[in-house]
Swiss-Prot record:
This is Signal recognition particle 19 kDa protein. The gene is srp19. Its main location: cytoplasm. The lineage of its organism: Archaea, Methanobacteriati, Methanobacteriota, Stenosarchaea group, Halobacteria. SUPFAM superfamilies: SRP19. GO terms for molecular function: 7S RNA binding. It comes from the Archaea. The keyword DNA repair does not apply. It comes from Haloferax volcanii (strain ATCC 29605 / DSM 3757 / JCM 8879 / NBRC 14742 / NCIMB 2012 / VKM B-1768 / DS2) (Halobacterium volcanii). Disruption phenotype: No effect on cell growth, membrane protein insertion, protein secretion, or ribosome levels. One of its GO terms (biological process) is SRP-dependent cotranslational protein targeting to membrane, signal sequence recognition. The keyword Ribonucleoprotein applies. Belongs to the SRP19 family. Involved in targeting and insertion of nascent membrane proteins into the cytoplasmic membrane. Binds directly to 7S RNA and mediates binding of the 54 kDa subunit of the SRP. Keywords: Cytoplasm, Ribonucleoprotein, RNA-binding, Signal recognition particle.
Amino acid sequence: MVENVIYPAYLDASLSRSEGRRVAQSAAVEAPTVDEIAKAVQQVGYDAVIERDKRYSREFETRGRVLVNNADDATKNDIVQAVAAYVGILRD
């Protein structure tokens, strides 16, 4: 069983790539929350577990993280790109 971790910093439009953003600026959103990310993960078709007390190592503030379970058929990059697209759709 593979667990992938998605931090809000991966999708944050206010961060640079060197600060932790993993998607293109056009796909990123401003200040994503773990709730939005978890909802998008479920829309993509994977199980999501929210851990609110975790912190991304490059950030000072604790924003939490989302564990993506049962994602054996996709790479982490594929999952992050799909989740970014769905978070953008949820915001519209």
